[in-house]
Amino acid sequence: MGVEWTNQYKLLPWMSLDLDLAYTRARFTDFDPVGNFIPGAPSWVASGGVTFGRDTGWFGSLRARYFGPRPLIEDDSVRSLSSFIVNARAGYKFDNGMRLQLDVLNLFNAQTNQIEYYYLSRLPGEPIDGVADRHVHPAEPLAVRLTLAATF
């Protein structure tokens, strides 16, 4: 069971705001003594931003994404941390189809994980039965990308 809210508001002919929110109470419906939580299903997810620009000239955006904490196993005894990432973009569109764009990903260099799992694994020197532990894909650190593109 859940609800989603998606909207976009045009403040000016060259500027818009958008916000997407989702809430869910994700559970397995059949009884299981292990638990009824769905691993990896966050209760809250949000994304939004401000975008500006016209067909030519300056353009840009500031965008944010949030994933709430989520159960990593069915009994909800192990949970992930929430994550919050902000990205920025600025550039210039020329009337000849050229575009110069600068992207700053993970603008605030958030030390968070893109995704987390919890399962048995075995590294050298660990017990033969393995060790239950978190397995993560960390968010990429702050990165800057410059793009020069042409449309023809």
Q: Can you say where each PLM-predicted feature lies in the sequence?
A:
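Short, glycine/charged-rich beta-strand-loop motifs at protein surfaces that mediate ligand recognition
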Residues: 73-79, 87-91, 105, 134
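Residues that define the transmembrane beta-barrel architecture of outer-membrane proteins
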Residues: 1, 40-46, 82-86, 140-144
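C-terminal beta-signal and adjacent terminal beta-strands/loops
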Residues: 92-152
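Flexible, surface-exposed loop regions and adjacent strand-edge segments
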Residues: 33-41, 67-68, 77-82, 116-125
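Flexible, active-site-adjacent loop/turn segments at secondary-structure boundaries
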Residues: 26, 36, 70, 83, ...
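Glycine-rich loops and low-complexity Gly/Arg-rich segments
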Residues: 17, 42-45, 75, 84-90, ...
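Gram-negative outer-membrane beta-barrel transporters
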Residues: 1-73, 149-151
